[in-house]
């Protein structure tokens, strides 16, 4: 497992300390959990936003493919 140095505001550290007491987990575990959840959310957001690339495009997707293939 790698290590990183992270600067956080005093307020965030205070909130982490409060969570540490509530959940009886070390700050390192809380931060790992938060980063894991963030990465999962980012991955899901990326997948759900992909169809939006074609949103508003009036051209039919199949017709677009045909045009591209005609260029070959």
Swiss-Prot record:
Gene Ontology terms, MF aspect:
sequence-specific DNA binding
Instruction: Enumerate the InterPro entries for this protein.
Output: Arc_rbn_hlx_hlx
Which Gene Ontology terms describe the biological processes this protein takes part in? regulation of DNA-templated transcription
Q: Which family does it belong to?
A: To E.coli YiiE.
What protein does this entry describe?
Answer: Uncharacterized protein YiiF
